[in-house]
Amino acid sequence: VSDAFDLLVLGDGNPDLVLTGAVEPAFGQAERLVEGARLTVGGSGAILAAGAARLGLRVGFCGVVGDDHFGRFLREELERRGVDVGGLVVDETGPTGVTVVLARPNDRAILTHAGTIADLRTELIDPARLERARHVHVSSYFLQERLTPELPALFERVRAHGATTSVDPNWDPAERWDGGLRDLLGQIDVFLPNETEATRIADLPELGEAVLALAERAGIVVAKAGAEGAVAAHGERLVRARPPTVDALDTTGAGDAFDAGYLASMLAGDPAERSLAIANACGALSTRAVGGVDAQPTMDEVLTLLSLGDAGR
């Protein structure tokens, strides 16, 4: 179908205000000056959608924003980055979510007002969009309280017409680490947690062990471990890959750029090892600028970085 999406993202979108420098707040009405402040695309789903579009995929985004400045900002920024936002619903009763990121070079603290983030549900998603997607990704599973109970039926529907599925759970603010997710694993083709999320969801302390346990139920499990790279499991086979070294300014959105790279490579038919290498390169390159989207690479940049790495071996 000429108007099909390679990737349809169902998820969270909200602006991120990223502060850099001496970002530890001091209460007692003390004012501190930080080095930088940037308002940019935030929300795991929106960052992933922008990253996948940058890599050349045809991407649609479905989410909910409020009828306010932050919602309009998100729509305009995603459109500017080549994402189809026809599925971005405006809720006139609630505010768009917003996140403040206190960013250090290799770590960050995140403060989020959820706003409309949790309001996405099946009835707000155009069925024609789902039917026109090669792959459907759900971001921030634990934040999407209204969508998650409906995902088993939704995934059954999209897989019945040949689409593949993926989920990035992201952090569980309640730290319960289930919410129906374990039961959904059997319908997830690619499960994309980070190291902490994988070990908490599997309830196993060691990453390799956790990934293998999750892979007994999900198709492929790919766990991000930051500067250590990533671990993937398919059946009983475990693959590890280290990321290329770059000068990191801000790791915000690196995991989402990683996801975008993995899915783009997988949808191109690449083997798991290559998808892992491309994902690692996308994650690493995305840390070169403040915020989640401004340093997201093109596929040419990724392949150049990987060829330099191969030449240096």
Please describe what each predicted stretch is.
Residues 77-93:
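A glycine-rich helix N-cap at a beta->alpha junction
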Residues 13, 141, 257:
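Active-site metal-binding loops of divalent metal-dependent hydrolases
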Residues 135-212, 228-230:
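Conserved beta-alpha-beta core of the PfkB/ribokinase-like small-molecule kinase fold
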Residues 90, 101-145, 149:
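Conserved phosphate-binding/catalytic loop of the ribokinase/pfkB sugar-kinase fold
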Residues 1-8, 33, 157, 207-313:
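Conserved phosphate-binding/catalytic region of the ribokinase-like
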Residues 2, 129-133, 185-186, 215:
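A short, aliphatic-rich alpha-helical micro-motif
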Residues 1-64, 69-80, 248-249, 313:
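Glycine-rich phosphate/adenosyl-contacting loop at the front of the ribokinase-like
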